[in-house]
């Protein structure tokens, strides 16, 4: 396989790391993205030491970690807001991270994961309703 394949694997594994971190940390999306990027960069460095890809592995995995963290943080936040338990949500998100990591080994899907997960999260964010919009109208005299 060429370097493009290993860069895609690094990006996909970075996304999986970001998803796992978003499910296990109780932090803001920015903090999850930073930690996800750091873990992704470490994964990318490991892949770079093992297979060709040069600095592209490290950059792709770091970007994937940040993208996965931001995307999954939106989903986790919504699940917890709607009454999901922290442990149950973390377990489900860990399973999703495992599935994302498995899909990263399919050629070109790692790239797709790094682009699709933040796009889905942005769509969810736009569709989320205003919280307690009706109560504000009742408070007016």
Q: Where are the predicted features?
A:
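Loop-to-transmembrane alpha-helix initiation sites
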Residues: 54-63, 104-117
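N-terminal signal-anchor/start-transfer transmembrane helix
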Residues: 3-25
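Hydrophobic, membrane-inserted alpha-helices
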Residues: 14-16, 40-42, 91-101, 117-118
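Membrane-helix boundary connector in multi-pass membrane proteins
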Residues: 81-86, 90-91, 95-113
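Alpha-helical transmembrane-segment detector that highlights a single hydrophobic TM helix
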Residues: 50-82
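Alpha-helical transmembrane segments and their membrane-interface exit regions
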Residues: 14-18, 64-73, 116-128
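Short, highly charged, low-complexity non-transmembrane loops/tails of multi-pass membrane proteins
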Residues: 124-141
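Cytoplasmic-side transmembrane-helix entry/capping segments in multi-pass membrane proteins
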Residues: 25-39, 57-63, 82-94
């Amino acid at each position: 396989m060429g370097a493009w394949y290993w860069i895609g694997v690094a990006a996909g594994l970075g996304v999986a790391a970001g998803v796992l971190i978003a499910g296990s940390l109780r932090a803001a999306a920015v903090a999850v993205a930073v930690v996800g990027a750091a873990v992704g960069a470490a994964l990318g460095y490991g892949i770079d030491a093992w297979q060709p890809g040069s600095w592209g592995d490290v950059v792709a995995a770091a970007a994937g970690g940040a993208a996965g963290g931001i995307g999954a943080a939106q989903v986790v936040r919504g699940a917890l807001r709607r009454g999901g338990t922290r442990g149950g949500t973390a377990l489900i998100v860990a399973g999703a991270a495992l599935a994302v990591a498995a899909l990263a080994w399919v050629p070109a899907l790692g790239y797709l994961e790094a682009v699709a997960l933040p796009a889905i999260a942005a769509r969810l964010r736009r569709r989320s309703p205003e919280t307690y919009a009706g109560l504000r109208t009742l408070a007016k005299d």
